[in-house]
């Protein structure tokens, strides 16, 4: 199996999972068709399944054109969604089977209300796999366009509970921007400073900073560290200044999210 990031727009990644024996390819959140079609053509692969995490156009805009090229495409997307192009709709607890890999569907509302993620404990490249759209990023999380802090905190808890070695394939290259905020929020965190330098080096060489892992995000990502003393202290100081609620894990998360929104 190969997982390949196809760049789209200015900072999207369209993840393509290919069975190298058959050439069959699963595509996650194709916001644009052309870069995917070019990749498939250049590689000699063919698309047979699309996974949609949520309805935003930069995740769904290429579906119709891909379907025109591959009329038998299975298009999997969330139920009760503004996106109406799915041939198969799924919700939390459902399974999607592709080329011997079983993906469990997780409900992760917050960024949008219809947001889902796809997790498989079938190891690809020696790791379980998570396609999480815009819920979790490297050192960040999705902005709350539709959901509440309580919903997003619960969704991130769901992802945080996955095995530490789970490879996290998010949909955007936001890492350096996220790290600028994280370093501002936690200026004494030496691990963040070291990680920022490593990510700058990757980007200077044209390399993606994704995938990350659940374990790495638990150590570094301020949006997952609501029980970390350093993050709690920063959140309480911020909450006092901005008259926000304190005293719970969700309140810590909400303070960090509020801080990022106003950074």
UniProtKB/Swiss-Prot annotation:
The keyword Zinc applies. The gene is gloB. Its cofactor is Zn(2+). Keywords: Hydrolase, Metal-binding, Zinc. It comes from Marinobacter nauticus (strain ATCC 700491 / DSM 11845 / VT8) (Marinobacter aquaeolei). This is Hydroxyacylglutathione hydrolase. Thiolesterase that catalyzes the hydrolysis of S-D-lactoyl-glutathione to form glutathione and D-lactic acid. Disulfide bonds: none annotated. NCBIfam families: GSH_gloB. Zn(2+) 1 binds at residues 54, 56, 111, 134. One of its GO terms (molecular function) is metal ion binding. SMART domains: Lactamase_B. Its EC number is 3.1.2.6. It is an enzyme of class 3 (hydrolase). The keyword Iron-sulfur does not apply. It catalyses: an S-(2-hydroxyacyl)glutathione + H2O = a 2-hydroxy carboxylate + glutathione + H(+). SUPFAM superfamilies: Metallo-hydrolase/oxidoreductase. Zn(2+) 2 binds at residues 58-59, 134, 172. GO terms for biological process: methylglyoxal catabolic process to D-lactate via S-lactoyl-glutathione. Binds 2 Zn(2+) ions per subunit. Monomer. Belongs to the metallo-beta-lactamase superfamily. Glyoxalase II family.
């Amino acid at each position: 199996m190969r997982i390949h990031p196809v760049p789209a727009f200015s900072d999207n990644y369209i993840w393509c999972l290919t069975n190298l024996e058959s050439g069959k390819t699963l595509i996650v959140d194709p916001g644009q068709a052309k870069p995917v079609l070019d990749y498939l053509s250049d590689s000699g692969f063919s698309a047979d399944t699309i996974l949609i995490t949520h309805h935003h156009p930069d995740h769904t805009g290429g579906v119709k054109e891909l379907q025109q090229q591959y009329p038998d495409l299975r298009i999997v997307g969330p139920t009760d969604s503004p996106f109406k192009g799915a041939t198969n709709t799924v919700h939390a607890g459902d399974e999607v089977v592709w080329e011997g890999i079983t993906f469990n569907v997780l409900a992760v509302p917050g960024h949008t209300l219809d947001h889902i993620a796809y997790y498989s404990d079938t190891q690809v490249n020696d790791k379980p796999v998570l396609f999480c759209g815009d819920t979790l990023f490297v050192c960040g999380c999705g902005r709350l366009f539709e959901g509440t802090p309580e919903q997003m905190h619960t969704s991130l808890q769901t992802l945080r509970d996955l095995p530490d070695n789970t490879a996290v394939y998010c949909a955007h290259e936001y890492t350096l921007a996220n790290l600028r905020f994280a370093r501002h929020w936690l200026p004494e965190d030496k691990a963040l400073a070291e990680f920022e330098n490593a990510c700058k080096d990757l980007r200077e060489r044209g390399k993606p900073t994704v995938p990350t892992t659940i374990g790495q995000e638990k150590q570094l990502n301020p949006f997952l560290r609501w029980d970390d003393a350093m993050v709690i202290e920063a959140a309480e100081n911020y909450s006092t200044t901005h008259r926000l609620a304190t005293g719970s894990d969700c309140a810590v998360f909400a303070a960090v999210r509020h801080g990022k929104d106003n950074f």
